[in-house]
């Protein structure tokens, strides 16, 4: 395993741990999700370039599209929650309430 792969795997693991441990604020959760998506994108791109798979060269672009959609939905949810409740605490969110 090369040093670059190990760094990207460590970045993914740290982002995952940040998502699991520090989930009190919605903004920190969204930043951890973006870090995970970015490290996945870099790892997939490096793997495809190293193995010379021309048929799979579109997969990282599709992942970036999903990451952009996830970021847009997350930010719109963050704006809605912060204007409604005045804070972005994840603990105050309950999907069963109206």
From Swiss-Prot:
It is a multi-pass membrane protein. The chain crosses the membrane at residues 1-21, 29-49, 61-81. Belongs to the complex I subunit 4L family. Its EC number is 7.1.1.2. It is an enzyme of class 7 (translocase). This is NADH-ubiquinone oxidoreductase chain 4L. Gene3D superfamilies: 1.10.287.3510. Pfam families: Oxidored_q2. Keywords: Electron transport, Membrane, Mitochondrion, Mitochondrion inner membrane, NAD, Respiratory chain, Translocase, Transmembrane, Transmembrane helix, Transport, Ubiquinone. The gene is MT-ND4L. GO terms for molecular function: NADH dehydrogenase (ubiquinone) activity. GO terms for cellular component: mitochondrial inner membrane; respiratory chain complex I. Core subunit of the mitochondrial membrane respiratory chain NADH dehydrogenase (Complex I) which catalyzes electron transfer from NADH through the respiratory chain, using ubiquinone as an electron acceptor. Part of the enzyme membrane arm which is embedded in the lipid bilayer and involved in proton translocation. It catalyses: a ubiquinone + NADH + 5 H(+)(in) = a ubiquinol + NAD(+) + 4 H(+)(out). Core subunit of respiratory chain NADH dehydrogenase (Complex I) which is composed of 45 different subunits. The keyword Transport applies. It is found in: Mitochondrion inner membrane. GO terms for biological process: ATP synthesis coupled electron transport. PANTHER family: NADH-UBIQUINONE OXIDOREDUCTASE CHAIN 4L, NADH-UBIQUINONE OXIDOREDUCTASE SUBUNIT ND4L.
């Amino acid at each position: 395993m090369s040093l670059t792969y190990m760094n990207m795997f460590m970045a993914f693991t740290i982002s995952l741990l940040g998502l699991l441990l520090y989930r009190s604020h919605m903004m920190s959760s969204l930043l951890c999700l973006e870090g995970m998506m970015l490290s996945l994108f870099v790892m997939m791109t490096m793997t495809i370039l190293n193995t010379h798979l021309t048929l799979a060269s579109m997969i990282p672009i599709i992942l970036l599209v999903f990451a952009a959609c996830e970021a847009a939905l997350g930010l719109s949810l963050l704006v809605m929650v912060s204007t409604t409740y005045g804070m972005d605490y994840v603990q105050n969110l309950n999907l069963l309430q109206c």
